[in-house]
């Protein structure tokens, strides 16, 4: 979710390097002369490898351009924003990080679901729902099933059935409330509520 600071930087951008799954209305803040470069990926299909993105950011910055890197979701939560920042700094480029509001909290809130609530959940965890080694992730989910608190799984739709199965096999009651939210910031927004036993999209 964007902030006023982010919108102000977009107005000044000479180059915008942007991801998939962003709110396209944000690009309306850019001036007409801004060079817009799409580097997104979806479902494992990359328009550009991460190393190429790093090199592109460095190249444009070395041209003296004011570059804005607009990442989908939270750039520092499973978003590789830290890798890009470290690459640029290691090559002598000054960076400024302008945080938005993390989707892990904002999207559930938009759906009327607080991640913590008195007498229900006093903590929450954020877990990736997609990784190269899914077997180890399922094992981690099973092992964490005994923990209290709200679990937020980002990018987990493809593996929803396996995630819920891992939670139940780890000891979470089947009637534990669950929700699936997709398209949190665009017109594809959809929410489905249920339990671990029956949730599906």
Where are these regions (language model features)?
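Class I SAM-dependent methyltransferase SAM-binding "motif I" and its flanking Rossmann-like core
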Residues: 72-147, 190-193, 197
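A contiguous loop/helix-start segment that scaffolds small-molecule binding in enzyme catalytic cores
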Residues: 62-67, 131, 135-201
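Class I S-adenosyl-L-methionine
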Residues: 4-101
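Short, glycine-rich nucleotide/cofactor-binding loops
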Residues: 1, 44, 131-132
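Structural motif
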Residues: 17, 68-69, 126, 152-154
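Short, solvent-exposed amphipathic alpha-helical segments in soluble enzyme
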Residues: 4-9, 31-34, 83-87, 113, ...
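Short hydrophobic/aromatic-enriched beta-strand-loop microsegments
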Residues: 34-41, 92-96, 115-122, 171-180
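Hydrophobic packing residues within well-ordered alpha-helices of enzyme cores
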Residues: 26-27, 88, 107, 163, ...
């Amino acid at each position: 979710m964007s902030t006023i600071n982010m919108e102000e930087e977009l107005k000044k951008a000479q180059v915008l390097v942007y991801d998939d799954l962003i709110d396209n209305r944000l690009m309306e803040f850019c001036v007409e002369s801004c060079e817009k470069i799409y580097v997104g990926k979806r479902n494992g299909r990359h328009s550009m490898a991460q190393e190429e993105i790093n090199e592109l950011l460095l190249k444009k910055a070395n041209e003296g351009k004011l570059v804005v890197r607009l990442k989908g979701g939270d750039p520092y939560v499973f978003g590789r924003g830290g890798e890009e920042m470290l690459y640029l700094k290691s090559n002598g480029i000054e960076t400024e990080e302008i945080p938005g509001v993390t989707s892990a909290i904002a999207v559930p809130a938009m759906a009327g679901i607080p991640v913590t609530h008195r007498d229900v959940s006093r903590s929450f965890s954020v877990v990736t729902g997609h990784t190269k080694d899914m077997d180890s992730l399922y094992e981690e989910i099973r092992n964490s099933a005994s923990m209290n608190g709200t679990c937020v799984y980002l990018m987990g739709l493809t593996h929803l059935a396996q995630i819920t199965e891992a939670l139940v096999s780890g000891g979470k009651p089947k009637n534990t409330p669950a929700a699936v939210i997709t398209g949190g910031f665009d017109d594809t927004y959809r929410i489905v509520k249920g339990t671990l036993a029956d949730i599906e999209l």
